[in-house]
Amino acid sequence: KADKEFEIGFLGDSFTEGASVTYEDSFVGIFKSSTKKDVANLGVVSYSPKIYLSKINYLLNEGYKFNQIVIFIDISDLYDDSFYYSLNDKLEVGENSKRGKKLFIRRILRSNFPFTNFYMYVLKNLNKKEEVDLKKINYTRPTFHKDAILKSIWTYSEKDFIKGYFGSISENQKKMMNTMDELYKLLEKKGIEMSLAVYPWPQQLEYDVENSEQVKMWENFCTDRCKHFFNFFPYFFES
């Protein structure tokens, strides 16, 4: 069972997976190369806390062993967790909406038919009706896609109810932290340490503050739970 034993397992979404780079160039690959530790990259695009819990539960039941799990909580996790996913009593992930079903289809295409998925992406973007007027672009300020704005706005919006979200932001925060608490208890029962890491999106650098709601909620959550809390917001705000 040597191939099922790891010092550290990294959990997260596409940022952790390193979707646009080779494994060696991902931060997990760089960490493994520099530390020589036996690590597993468990990150996959569009993952969020409900899937973190489900995946770890599955891996532990399959006999995988870890000394520590490090979870890179993404800004989009709150939206994805509340909008797309549900969990049953067996900790199995299901779809939470019609959009959720589309997300599962995209993940299947990406994993099993990468070229088909790529060409669908290209065709979709080529057929967009809206034309971009390059003369009207303000090159001194960043331009963000509406989906990215929607998923990131909760950390700096003063509203508790935001159009496009299911339920209130505060209620979704509580649900997400409850899911993460379940994950913590599952790991603790197996003698596995848990650490969390947070990092900003470009939208946070433009509209949010260094001591973001994302930082405060997870730093508070980590009290008496985490081995380490890694806050990467200061590094990005300084640069």
Tell where the protein language model's regions lie, with residue ranges.
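Anion (oxyanion) recognition and catalysis
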Residues: 33, 188, 223
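Membrane-embedded segments
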Residues: 1-71, 75-79
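A generic structural signal for ordered secondary structure
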Residues: 9, 67, 177, 226-227
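Serine-dependent acyl-ester chemistry module
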Residues: 75-219, 232-238
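Hydrophobic anchor at the start of a short beta-strand
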Residues: 39, 194, 229
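Short, surface-exposed linear patches
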Residues: 30-34, 61-64, 91-95, 216-220
